[in-house]
Regions:
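Active-site and donor-binding regions of nucleotide-sugar-utilizing enzymes
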Residues: 1-104, 207-210, 217-220, 225-228, ...
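Charged active-site motifs of nucleotide-sugar-dependent glycosyltransferases
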Residues: 7-8, 140-146, 178-179
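Conserved catalytic-core segment of nucleotide-activated headgroup transferases in glycan assembly
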Residues: 20-21, 26, 33, 152-182
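Short, charged/polar "capping" segments at the starts of alpha-helices
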Residues: 46-52, 155, 186-192, 245-250
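Active-site regions of enzymes building and remodeling cell-envelope glycoconjugates
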Residues: 57-65, 84, 95, 191-202, ...
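Mid-sequence helix-capping/hinge segment at a functional interface
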Residues: 92-160
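Donor-binding and catalytic core of enzymes assembling or modifying cell-surface/extracellular glycoconjugates
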Residues: 163-242
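Nucleotide-sugar donor-binding patch of glycosyltransferase catalytic domains
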Residues: 230-291
Length: 291
């Protein structure tokens, strides 16, 4: 059997950005069963803007952007042919219509990668948390609150508070002395006319990540950005609700199924039934004070 870097692995999860981060603990398991192996980390071309966040990860030997936006091409298949262990990077849901009432997203991604629950349970608590290396310089903006207000490139409204909710809390934050930096998709609505509010959705994705990393904390929703800053171990508040429906099954149990892991346990999840608008703004403001 091949050993060390001669043993090559293709994986882990190519899209979407949040999913690729949720799947990072699979690398910890692979390192246990194939020590010192060479690991290709495939990223779908449509998510290539996120590639820099994976630089310096200790268990990623090479990042490979797929030949096509959403699937592999000849170059990808040629590499896979040389690999000794291949993980389906676009797998089906492990347990469609019910997983979100039983487990969180990290465990679901682990099972979707083809491994067993018993193997997931063997990981330590730290190994179950996605990790990213904060390798770039960060400019501290300790008086600025970052918000990533909308999910799914602004198209999945049920996963986030309404515009009205955001406008109200931004006004309260600014009146309390904070500056507010709005990150996300460039087509998202502007939420304030205040000089202490800035919209940065026109910046590149990676520039947004770098700028946000210097803020006091970020307020996110059920979206990939929450997983990025959780993997960096940065302070964050995540606004959650039971929005999800799959195969006619509603999300009624395991309320934190969509909560991001935070590598340094610096995430506070605020959950409300039916809508994020039901999360009390006073609770959000108090949570910021408590950080």
């Amino acid at each position: 059997m091949k050993t060390d870097k001669n043993f090559k692995i293709w994986g882990i999860r190519s899209a979407l950005i949040g999913d690729t981060i949720m799947a990072l603990p699979v690398l910890n398991h692979l390192e246990k069963i194939f020590p010192n192996s060479y690991k290709y980390f495939s990223i779908a071309k449509k998510c290539s803007q996120a590639a820099p966040i994976y630089f310096n990860h200790p268990l990623i030997d090479r990042i490979k952007i797929t030949d096509f936006p959403e699937h592999n091409g000849d170059t990808d298949r040629a590499i896979m042919k040389e690999c000794d262990f291949i993980i389906n990077t676009s797998p089906p849901v492990y347990e469609s219509g019910s997983w979100f009432n039983k487990r969180g997203q990290v465990e679901e991604c682990f099972l979707m990668a083809g491994f067993l629950k018993s193997e997931f349970d063997e990981l330590t608590d730290e190994e179950k948390k996605p990790y990213l290396d904060l390798w770039f310089d960060v400019k501290k903006e300790s008086n600025t609150i970052a918000i990533w207000p909308f999910a799914g490139y602004g198209k999945w409204l049920s996963r986030a508070p309404s515009e009205e909710w955001w406008r109200e809390i931004i006004d309260k934050l600014i009146k309390s002395g904070w500056k507010v930096a709005h990150f996300g998709w460039h087509e998202e609505p502007r939420l304030s006319e205040s000089e202490n509010y800035s919209f940065l959705g026109n910046e590149s994705f990676f520039d947004q990540v770098k700028i946000c990393s210097g803020c006091k904390l970020s307020i996110c929703t059920d979206t990939g950005s929450a997983w990025i800053f959780g993997a960096y171990g940065l302070p964050q508040i995540t606004l959650l609700t039971n929005h999800f429906v799959q195969d006619g099954v509603r999300h009624t149990e395991y309320p934190l199924a969509f909560a991001p892991e935070n590598y340094k346990d610096l995430n506070i999840n605020l959950f409300a039934e039916d809508s994020c608008d039901n999360i009390k703004q006073e609770l959000v403001l108090q949570t910021i004070k408590d950080f």
